[in-house]
Design a protein with these regions (language model features):
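Pocket-forming structural segment of enzyme catalytic cores
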Residues: 12-13, 35-111
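Active-site acidic short loop of glycosyltransferases
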Residues: 21, 85, 119
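Histidine-centered divalent metal-coordination motifs
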Residues: 27, 93, 128
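Hydrophobic/aromatic beta-strand patches that form the interior of the parallel beta-sheet core
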Residues: 24, 46, 90, 123-125
Length: 146
């Protein structure tokens, strides 16, 4: 909620939503692009009409936050151009976006969820491409080339 309050105070919320060039939100940036987040019960930017949920461990071995390497599957976005198999990327998060019409890649941790979103000129990743080695570099290069 603090981040959204800052964006509103600086009048950046409307500016971000009006951008026409490609925009990439990473981790919290992806969550802020959604409609609402259970983290702080915050209303967000609403670019993606979907809510952010908190992971609820279902088994003893399920740890929250989800930290570490995991795979991207069902990739279908320009961010993943050149991907021909499941790729590993790095995650650190306690909240997730359920699968929805904007899902650009899927990851499974506790349950399947959206690890990337895409709508118009807005792209978002729950994982950290900047911490994901050569795969992350390829994703960032693909974004720069949009």
């Amino acid at each position: 909620e603090t981040t959204m309050n800052y964006l509103r105070e600086q009048q950046l919320d409307a500016l971000i939503k009006d951008l026409k060039q490609p925009v990439l939100g990473i981790c919290l940036g992806m969550q802020l692009m959604c409609r609402h987040s259970e983290e702080g019960n915050a209303d967000c930017l609403g670019i993606f009409d979907i809510d952010v949920k908190k992971f609820e461990p279902m088994r003893h071995e399920d740890k929250v936050p989800h930290m570490g390497w995991n795979t991207l599957t069902d990739t279908h976005s320009a961010l993943f151009k050149g991907f021909d198999k499941e790729e590993f990327v790095y995650f650190v998060h306690s909240f997730y976006v359920p699968l929805n019409e904007f899902t650009a890649s899927t990851t499974h941790y506790i349950l399947p969820y959206s690890s990337a979103l895409h709508k118009d000129n807005f792209y978002a990743t729950q994982f950290h491409p900047e911490k994901s080695g050569a795969v992350g570099e390829r994703i960032l290069r693909n974004f720069i080339e949009l």
